[in-house]
Amino acid sequence: MIIEIPKGNNIKYEIDVESGLLFANRKLPSSMIYPCNYGFIPRTRESNGDPVDVFILGDDPLLPMSVIEVNPIGILLTEDQDGKDSKIIAKPVEKVDATYCMLTDLTDIPPTILNTLEHFVLHHKDLEKDKYVKIERWDNKTLAKTIISEAINRYDIFMKTHNKI
């Protein structure tokens, strides 16, 4: 996956998938910071047209545009002003960072981490006009992997139907 926003940052960066450039989208208007490194899985397409979003558990901020190999261990299903917007929860593969290697599914993640992520997702848009987030539910790595597979298929179909392959 590709890092867009480092842990501890309050600037929302987004990679433009067409140009490959990293843009500073906006500063979070609240006093919140990203509780984890945040990015996306390339060559995926959610139903809202965006790549699949991922929060990566870890203690160290990673540089934007970094590529890191991760394993999904859960998913937070949400909806915002633009529609369904899933957030995969992942851990770095063991060779990158063994700190979280014992986590294999959503139920292994400490409640304090889940609560922090949920609070951030639910409130990071609070001071932005006409923006909101609703949390549907947490789910396990099986659904996370299914969502990723569907998004890969959706991306492939999109690319073929738009003559981009």
PLM segments and residue spans:
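Hydrophobic N-terminal alpha-helices or hydrophobic patches in metabolic proteins across all domains
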Residues: 1-165
